[in-house]
Amino acid sequence: MNTNKLHKQINLIGERAQAASQIVSGLSIDERNKILLSFASEIEKNSDKIVEINVQELKEHRDDLSLPMQKRLQLSKEKISTIASSLKALVKLADPLSEGNTSWQAKAGFKVVKKTVPLGVVAMIYEARPNVTIDAAALTIKSANAVILRGGKESIKTNQVLVSILQQSLKKLGYSENIVQLIEDTSHDSVKELLHLRKFIDVLIPRGSGSFINYVVDNSTVPVIETGAGNDHIFVDKSADQEEAIKVIVNSKIQNPSVCNSAEKLLVHADIAKEFLPKLFDRLSNEGVEIRGDKEVQLIDNRVELAKDFDWDTEYNDLIIAVHLVNNLKEAIDWIGKHTTHHTEAILTNSAENASEFMQRIDAAVVTENASTRFTDGFEFGFGAEIGISTQKLHARGPMGLTALTSYKYEIFGHGEIRK
């Protein structure tokens, strides 16, 4: 598309979203929930159509995508049913605008009210996973925001049909279809345009690879919530229950290897490595996991491919794990500090002292003791769905549910008071 034409088109989308945000911010919680129930109903009614288009799109891109990535793009009837159920579950959650509201009397006599409000216009730029289209639309509407969606080229046809269904639902209920909008241009230019649409967008949330998110953070003039990559580590302390550790590591790696809360790196205390690693590698190899490691790990088991320097900072999103030996807790903490993406870091140990030090010193959005990294998830935390997992410290951190899509304002109620 002509650059000038694209600029005008995306500015128009931004302008419409800003106007729509004023509409949705005035809707009651009952009205917002009614929209979500309509979404659920229409998605289920149109499931055959969605699956047909999704299957066709997957065939077009199959040769260019890894198997885990294909799974992320797939929308089966079962997945659609799960999405519809999650929308109905979201309806049951409390109104985020009703939370955190407080008031007090100021010394000068007037009343101050701290009131929770929506952010306004939320823009989502994401790669792959078309279920993000529904999650983002539902969470933003529940929290009384408008949303602009820009998905990847691999799922553009699926996203088009999903957004069309959502917009039809809005129109049937008498609301503006501009509450949910999709940017259909999947070129790099459309991303650049969005990054500079500060006049209309209140916050931008990118989801995708580490390099993609870094590009957005480095180049956006719109405020960004960084949903960083997950180069997640598990440290197996020498006191760990080895059978339990194997169970947790296998779950963390293989349950869904293409997501950001999948374990990518394993640190093992050298004192237990010779006993522990062959048993673990048996399980991982049986599950099709490629094992990489340093020379010390190779000497223990010849199934290990020698890791390169880049491995220690790579989020694989695949059935690959890299293993490194450490001599003590301090070495593990220092290693993680050097290679972390501040997403999820875990320790497996029976030492309360070591667990406490690890939990205290590790700088990550989620730090886990004796549990799978896969629990870093808004649904698992009880937030309902999530719009992303923030790895920054401002404005939100960790799994972002409804309250992460709100801010607050102060209202003053006076009786003619003046400042002296």
From Swiss-Prot:
GO terms for cellular component: cytoplasm. One of its GO terms (molecular function) is glutamate-5-semialdehyde dehydrogenase activity. One of its GO terms (biological process) is L-proline biosynthetic process. Its EC number is 1.2.1.41. The keyword Amino-acid biosynthesis applies. The keyword Lyase does not apply. Pathway: Amino-acid biosynthesis; L-proline biosynthesis; L-glutamate 5-semialdehyde from L-glutamate: step 2/2. It catalyses: L-glutamate 5-semialdehyde + phosphate + NADP(+) = L-glutamyl 5-phosphate + NADPH + H(+). InterPro entries: Ald_DH/histidinol_DH, Ald_DH_C, Ald_DH_N, Aldehyde_DH_dom, G-glutamylP_reductase_CS, Glu-5-SA_DH, GPR_dom. Belongs to the gamma-glutamyl phosphate reductase family. This is Gamma-glutamyl phosphate reductase. It comes from Oenococcus oeni (strain ATCC BAA-331 / PSU-1). The gene is proA.
